[in-house]
């Protein structure tokens, strides 16, 4: 009888332990706020791919989506003069901060504010020039990057399951979600950055460089690229895309197709390129872990604008578009929690006014 009681007691303990383990196990992550690659339902999507994505090692060592891990805390920095770009001694100022993966793909608004995509919240916020915040779009399915064409058409990269590019304004509708008949998820990597042109198309990066024409038909361009940020010159004759520690360039043809791939510049300040933007003179600005790296339209390295932490994306806005904004990815506390910070700095250079970014 005693042995039976011990057996029953032991069984009850094991059952209770198993129940507690099940209760503590996190539910599978799926739905808005979860990037496709982390979604519990992604394996089912990948089973439908005619051409499956490459193994993770095939994406190369460059980070996909958020750039390099930041240092533990802020670092000392000194801004030196870059003629025509920034005066010596300028300082970065915090203008906004929020918990989670909730700031990326920033672009300017006409009134001097910025729009920012929120991954976790699946929303788009407007941060006005006075620091006031409002939600302008919701239900963006893990929106992670924004772009606006010179004609004012606003697009967002939705990074959730079955990633896609959506038009948000003037009319909300699907723009592109297939490559060679497959879901964008079959490409691999993360739907990263987007750049709209004046022809009605959108360039985007996702484990490579792609162009969705005005009808949403997608073509891939380039070889041996580890892409992240993408932008166009003010005259739209040249496309720039970050390629690890370098910046690549392509000539843009009349139909938006690309040719003449070349290494345009090395990021001499160190780190891999993430986001990018241009100013009114055609200079290119690349966000990296050391800070903002500035390159002339001829491909000459002009210098580094150091930042207190690594930055993942950037855009000109503010009065007369002479303020440079950047997004910092933070991990603070014990245990560390992710948050995002937007910082700004006064510039001599002026952002290109012909489009939002």
Annotate each PLM feature:
Residues 1, 22-23:
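Hydrophobic, aliphatic-enriched repeat segments that assemble into extended interaction scaffolds
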Residues 1-5, 314:
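Positively charged n-region of N-terminal signal peptides that target proteins for export
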Residues 5, 9-12, 129:
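Intrinsically disordered, low-complexity repeat segments enriched in small/polar residues
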Residues 9-21:
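Bacterial N-terminal signal peptides
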Residues 25-357:
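Sequence-structural signature of mature extracellular/luminal beta-sheet repeat domains
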């Amino acid at each position: 009888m005693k042995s039976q009681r011990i057996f029953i007691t032991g069984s009850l303990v094991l059952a209770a332990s198993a129940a507690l383990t099940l209760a503590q196990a996190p539910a599978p992550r799926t739905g808005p706020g979860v990037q496709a690659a982390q979604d519990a339902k992604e394996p089912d999507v990948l089973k439908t791919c005619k051409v499956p994505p490459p193994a993770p090692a095939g994406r190369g060592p460059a980070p996909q989506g958020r750039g390099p891990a930041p240092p533990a805390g802020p670092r000392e920095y000194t801004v030196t003069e870059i003629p025509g770009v920034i005066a010596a001694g300028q300082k970065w100022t915090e203008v906004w901060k929020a918990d989670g993966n909730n700031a990326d793909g920033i672009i300017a608004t006409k009134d001097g504010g910025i729009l920012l995509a929120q991954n976790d919240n699946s929303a788009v916020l407007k941060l006005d020039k006075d620091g006031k915040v409002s939600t302008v779009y919701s239900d963006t399915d893990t929106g992670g990057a924004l772009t606006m064409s010179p004609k004012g058409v606003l697009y967002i990269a939705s990074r959730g399951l079955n990633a896609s590019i959506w038009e948000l304004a003037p009319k909300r509708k699907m723009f592109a979600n297939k490559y060679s008949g497959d879901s964008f998820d079959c490409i691999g990597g993360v739907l990263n950055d987007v750049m709209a042109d004046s022809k009605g198309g959108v360039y985007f990066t996702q484990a490579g460089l792609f162009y969705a024409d005005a009808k949403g038909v997608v073509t891939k361009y380039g070889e041996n690229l580890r892409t992240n940020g993408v932008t166009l010159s003010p005259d739209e004759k040249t496309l720039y895309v970050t390629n690890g520690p370098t910046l690549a360039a392509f000539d843009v043809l009349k139909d938006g197709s690309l040719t003449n791939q070349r290494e345009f510049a090395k990021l001499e300040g160190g780190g891999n390129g993430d986001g990018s933007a241009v100013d009114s003179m055609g200079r290119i600005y690349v966000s990296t872990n050391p800070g903002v790296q500035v390159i002339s339209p001829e491909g000459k390295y002009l210098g580094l604008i150091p930042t207190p932490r690594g930055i993942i994306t950037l855009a000109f806005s503010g009065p007369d578009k002479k303020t440079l904004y950047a997004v910092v990815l933070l991990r603070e506390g014990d245990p560390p929690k992710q948050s995002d910070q937007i910082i700004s700095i006064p510039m001599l250079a002026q952002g290109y006014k012909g489009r939002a970014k």
